[in-house]
Amino acid sequence: MATVTAALVKELRERTAAGMMECKKALVEAEGDIELAIENMRKSGAAKAAKKAGNIAAEGTIIIKEEAGVAVLLEVNCQTDFVAKDSGFLGFANEVAEVALAERLNDIVALQAKFEDARIALVTKIGENISIRRVQLVEGVALASYRHGEKIGVVIAGEGDAETLKHIAMHVAASKPEYVNPSDVPADVVEKEKAVQVEIAMNEGKPQEIAEKMVIGRMKKFTGEVSLTGQAFIMEPKKTVADILKEKGASVSNFVRLEVGEGIEKAAEMSFADEVAAVQKG
């Protein structure tokens, strides 16, 4: 049996970022062959990552990276808020975002493939499912970004002074508009909401003809509420975002808002009794 020296363990740790005992075990099993140890650790890591893949990863971080005229927003997920603050996890997320920006990668599948080995290594080290979930590139004459903690990120593309666009980005973070202008709301979305509002009015005892007329005002309110320029501006609620943009000589052509875990169905939290039962089952 080959001797596993401290120097070999140190080198393997530096190359894999794995723990000391894991490195020593891998070297013993590989009879001191460091390349074989690395290969075996990668295979073991892939197997562990595959087992973790079914775990719900709804925590994580939003990263924003910018350079002249281009910005990237990235969502990387993990299972717990504790890991979301881990330096290794955040370092990985930042590296992915930097590459996405440098290579203008807007294809999530290609980005995932590029970082799969690094992801597997991180899953092995941290012990949680890690997912590169979403990436969005935004281009524009003028860009403004806003990050609310680690969980929400917004990038605005448009024209105007930096302060105005920054305030609009903050508004988007808080108010969650779905479209830029009321006219951008798709016809099928409008028709679906209109049908709901007509039914509500008729259930209130209104004849269909009157209900149809009542709904006109409600639909204007609806398209305003779901669009950026139609919303009341959070910093001056008596004015709409459109009013503010007009006053400042600014405009918004596009925006992207990402929030960690949105759309992911989280598992229901276990009660204390359920936790005890689970422990007893082993």
Curated annotation (Swiss-Prot):
One of its GO terms (cellular component) is cytoplasm. Residues 80-83 are annotated as: Involved in Mg(2+) ion dislocation from EF-Tu. Its main location: cytoplasm. Keywords: Cytoplasm, Elongation factor, Protein biosynthesis. It is found in: Cytoplasm. InterPro entries: EF-Ts_dimer_sf (IPR036402), Transl_elong_EFTs/EF1B (IPR001816), Transl_elong_EFTs/EF1B_dimer (IPR014039), Transl_elong_Ts_CS (IPR018101), UBA-like_sf (IPR009060). The keyword Protein biosynthesis applies. GO terms for molecular function: translation elongation factor activity. Belongs to the EF-Ts family. This is Elongation factor Ts. It comes from Aliivibrio salmonicida (strain LFI1238). The lineage of its organism: Bacteria, Pseudomonadati, Pseudomonadota, Gammaproteobacteria, Vibrionales.
